[in-house]
Amino acid sequence: MSRAYDLVVIGAGSGGLEAGWNAASLHKKRVAVIDLQKHHGPPHYAALGGTCVNVGCVPKKLMVTGANYMDTIRESAGFGWELDRESVRPNWKALIAAKNKAVSGINDSYEGMFADTEGLTFHQGFGALQDNHTVLVRESADPNSAVLETLDTEYILLATGSWPQHLGIEGDDLCITSNEAFYLDEAPKRALCVGGGYISIEFAGIFNAYKARGGQVDLAYRGDMILRGFDSELRKQLTEQLRANGINVRTHENPAKVTKNADGTRHVVFESGAEADYDVVMLAIGRVPRSQTLQLDKAGVEVAKNGAIKVDAYSKTNVDNIYAIGDVTDRVMLTPVAINEGAAFVDTVFANKPRATDHTKVACAVFSIPPMGVCGYVEEDAAKKYDQVAVYESSFTPLMHNISGSTYKKFMVRIVTNHADGEVLGVHMLGDSSPEIIQSVAICLKMGAKISDFYNTIGVHPTSAEELCSMRTPAYFYQKGKRVEKIDSNL
């Protein structure tokens, strides 16, 4: 039988839009895309472009860029700029207004895409399954809410993303998440960022730059070191630099209770027994797949305990015509990954060219101050897979910071290789421009570059990136999973 649509996509994020546009434009398919609203902001925050465009990568990068001017202004004196720093004031409202305008422009461009693409239509509401070929567009997340539309389709693509987690403690409702942080009326003078991941660290940097004078930013993390899963030496160095910038990093610390003071501020009691007052408590303790309102049981779609939709290498669920991509599958929660998965889905289903996204050697960045850029294995994981692993490392003060007054800003580079053949397994960097540098490095890793390819390449001088071309001697090794100073050829 002929169905009304070839494809219904639930979720207008980066992955969903990539799949929808490719299917309609490249393969002339009839595609419906469902999401909660067209433009960013409350009440739903999700809108055209998904988390990345509306309450994620894009606005965050703009705000971090603004925050970096704090150091630029301070450091300019070392380069001969005479500024009256007492007269320099951050304007949070101006930042948010500019950010909102930029994001609205992207929302508008996506609206234009729907208007200009034959066969591609947008449907506003909550998407939910009725069966494996029928999608309901509901008025709200309530499964009993009014049905606005019923869409009959051959294929279904689930691309609903992820959502910030809450702590589940008393006073949880008095805290905000990154969603609300993008729309605060004013920068908090006293802020607590809860969590040791990249979102918490990035917002700590933003709040630290825009806070009123005399303010304080605390970052509380229950573990012993921030950024679990990243290179351990970079984590240590970043912590030192965050503290040098004035951020109070509190490890082995977690809120136990939050109450509201008479003046509207928040009183936090920590698990350690310590207490403090804040204007804003922002939770950034992780994100969970957003699948709860999809009524997946109606079509028999399998999910993991955390709500992640189970898929195979080609993003297909256990139901033959239903696929899922992006954060909702809890594979690699990065926008470019979701985009690649969306394109691969269309290649597989509509182009008859089955393609699985390669989730290895994916570069990523932490837009902390200073930023981090990484790609590939950390040394501990490499040592579990390879018999002999070599670790190269370098830490230095970039040229500019010899006169900027920020000599504490070290640039750190660490390279992990398979010592048996020299293949570069991972590159990890901390310092200015790391996110830009790591993109080129990722191409090298994808091509199977060896450490000799790095040091036989002539560097660009004077840059921090040229250090990648100067690292010839390993600092230490791993052999049979154990760290050693040199390789024992008898083992």
From Swiss-Prot:
pH dependence: Optimum pH is 7.5-8.0.
Coiled coil: none
Residues forming the catalytic site: H461 (proton acceptor)
Pfam families tied to this protein: Pyr_redox_2 (PF07992), Pyr_redox_dim (PF02852)
Keyword flag Cytoplasm: yes
Cofactor annotation remark: Binds 1 FAD per subunit.
Subcellular location: Cytoplasm
Presence of the UniProt keyword ATP-binding in the record: no
Keywords (A to Z) from UniProt: Cytoplasm, Disulfide bond, FAD, Flavoprotein, NADP, Oxidoreductase, Redox-active center
Reactions catalysed: trypanothione + NADP(+) = trypanothione disulfide + NADPH + H(+)
GO BP: cell redox homeostasis; cellular response to oxidative stress; glutathione metabolic process
Cysteines paired by S-S bonds: C52-C57
Entry GO MF terms: flavin adenine dinucleotide binding; glutathione-disulfide reductase (NADPH) activity; trypanothione-disulfide reductase (NADPH) activity
GO CC terms, sorted: cytosol; mitochondrion
UniProt superkingdom: Eukaryota
Cofactor(s) of this protein: FAD
Similarity section: Belongs to the class-I pyridine nucleotide-disulfide oxidoreductase family.
Remarks, miscellaneous: The active site is a redox-active disulfide bond.
Protein name in the entry: Trypanothione reductase
Source organism (scientific name): Crithidia fasciculata
Lineage: Eukaryota, Discoba, Euglenozoa, Kinetoplastea, Metakinetoplastina
